[in-house]
Amino acid sequence: MAKHLLCSADHIEATDASAAMIAQAKRGNFPSKLYFSVQDMFHLPYADQSFDVVIVCNALHIVPHPEKALIEFRRVLKNDGTLIAPTFTHAENSPWGNLQALALKIAGFPLHSRWTSAAYLAFLQQNGWTVCKSVVLQNSIPLTYAECKKVERR
């Protein structure tokens, strides 16, 4: 995804928990404004309010305690920043989607959260985010795209 955002940003930090995924992403030639690194989404090495946009793509459903990741994204995101959080909403799978989900589990991507689209958006809201835009992309495994802003904490 980071490669497709190059014209939209001055600096991009593309991270993944998997060294193999980062190695694959690094293939090719890219401008110096794109940095790749292996990171833990629960403990990011960036200063508070470092980013205008944080994108977590297809990951919240496969990690235990995704609410803890949202706390870390809140920390590194500027107050007026945007969280973009598309994720698969497996509770609405077709039979083919259930088979694909099983294959993902066998490949090492277990589902820790099986949300419907509505439940996923409610999860984001319950964890301090205002959902400004959402779209469900229907497929054998539906994907719910969400753009969020921080809810001001009192």
Description of each model-found segment:
Residues 13, 37, 55-56, 84:
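Conserved Rossmann-like nucleotide-binding pocket used by diverse enzymes
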Residues 127-129, 133-154:
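Core SAM-dependent methyltransferase catalytic element
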Residues 42-54:
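A short acidic, Gly/Pro-enriched loop at the edge of an enzyme's catalytic core
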Residues 67-79:
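A short glycine-rich, Lys/Arg-flanked "PGG" loop and its adjoining helix->strand segment in the class I
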Residues 112-128:
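Short alpha-helix
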Residues 84-107:
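Conserved class I S-adenosyl-L-methionine
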Residues 53-66:
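A short SAM/SAH-binding and catalytic strip from SAM-dependent methyltransferases
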Residues 1-43:
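Class I SAM-dependent methyltransferase SAM/SAH-binding core
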